């Protein structure tokens, strides 16, 4: 079965304001943040695009989120308000201590093992989990304006171009590392030569 994977926080939900309010400062509260999803603003552009791809391809929608699955009631209320009817909603179990990318990767792995194929994903922070598997991603980039309001820009990322860019970046890092090592060795040789010269004198 073809699937479209959709993240919630910062992707389908334009809720960076809730993150600022509930996850920072002295009164930070994960519980209040997870419950507040029912009042989060729907990113209409993302919701419309998900429905459009689903209509064009016949793919089913799956929600894969790193948020606490203890608050499924609030999460499902939000998803319904966004106008999506996902085949599955995967939220991280409350006692799962793994980080979101690792957990999402395990969900993707199990979906693929069951014979599914993810044809597109919508993500804000964990997009590399999909790109590493060659899955096209719409990255929902959060942008804060000069008065502190959050805006979201959707950017399509081609996995082949992304992989090429990652290889190029890795090659540059390796070249820089080699040059640094060559410089260190040259410096050590020069110091050794100076020591020999001073001993000989």
Language model features with spans:
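Non-catalytic pre-domain segments flanking phosphatase-related domains
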Residues: 1-8, 16, 165, 171-201
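Alpha-helical substrate-recognition element adjacent to the catalytic core
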Residues: 2-98
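Intrinsically disordered, low-complexity terminal extensions
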Residues: 34, 146, 151-176
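Acidic, Mg2+-coordinating phosphoryl-transfer loop and its flanking beta/alpha structural elements
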Residues: 108, 116-160
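Donor nucleotide-activated moiety binding/catalytic core segment of transferases
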Residues: 99-112
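Surface-exposed amphipathic alpha-helices with a cationic face
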Residues: 51-55, 112, 131
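Short secondary-structure transition/capping segments
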Residues: 74-75, 100-102, 149-155
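Short coil/turn segments at beta-strand junctions that form active-site/ligand-binding loops
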Residues: 1-3, 57-60, 115-119, 135
